[in-house]
Design a protein with these regions (language model features):
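Short coil/turn segments at alpha/beta junctions that flank glycine-rich nucleotide-binding fingerprints
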Residues: 102, 118-123
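Conserved acetyl-CoA-binding loop-helix of GNAT-fold acetyltransferases
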Residues: 95, 101-115, 138-142
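Acetyl-CoA-dependent GNAT
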Residues: 6-10, 17-98, 115, 119, ...
Length: 171
């Protein structure tokens, strides 16, 4: 069973270790983390000291997913959009590369949605996925996110997705 806990600085090395090639790195963080390869220090700086580059204080919440069998298995972040505490954004979703395709991402994000809707009481959660990241797009659709729009960007178009509190029956 997947459980969530807040990110700790010691998790940065694990996350950096999953970003094994430039393609995975770009699909995970786009241009937000600079150049590949990434170091644990860069991740920790962004997560622990820079509030995820959010301009609003106390607006960025990185999470770690873990289970009893494998330990730490994934990570993602939550942040409120423009300070609106009714809309939450998920992002920087990554799963241990040795466990991809085993449903870990689905379980992790379902746990995140449960927390978002039941504990935080948000009305909607959004997420973006690059058009070229078919496995992630399918994962997000599987748990109930629906495509809202496609934003034309370089190097890849971005599919904006959302799920509303009343539509979270798959959680």
């Amino acid at each position: 069973m997947i459980r969530l806990r807040p990110y700790k600085s010691c998790d940065a090395a694990k996350i950096a270790g999953w970003l094994t090639d430039r393609d995975i790195f770009l699909k995970w963080g786009g241009d937000r983390f600079g150049e590949f390869p990434i170091t644990p220090q860069i991740i920790d700086e962004k997560y622990s000291r820079n509030n995820g580059d959010c301009t609003e204080p106390d607006n960025f919440y990185p999470w770690i997913a873990f289970d009893d069998e494998h330990g730490v298995v994934g990570s993602f972040i939550m942040r409120y959009l423009k300070g609106d505490n009714h809309i939450l954004r998920f992002g920087w979703v990554i799963v241990d590369d040795s466990l991809r395709g085993m449903g870990i991402g689905t379980q992790m994000l379902r746990a995140g949605l449960k927390y978002a809707f039941e504990i935080l009481g948000v009305d909607k959660v959004t997420i973006g996925v690059f058009e070229t990241n078919t496995p992630a797009h399918e994962c997000y659709k599987k748990i109930g996110f629906t495509d809202r729009e496609t934003v034309v960007k370089e190097p890849w178009n971005l599919i904006e997705m959302e799920i509303e509190a009343c539509r979270n029956q798959n959680i």
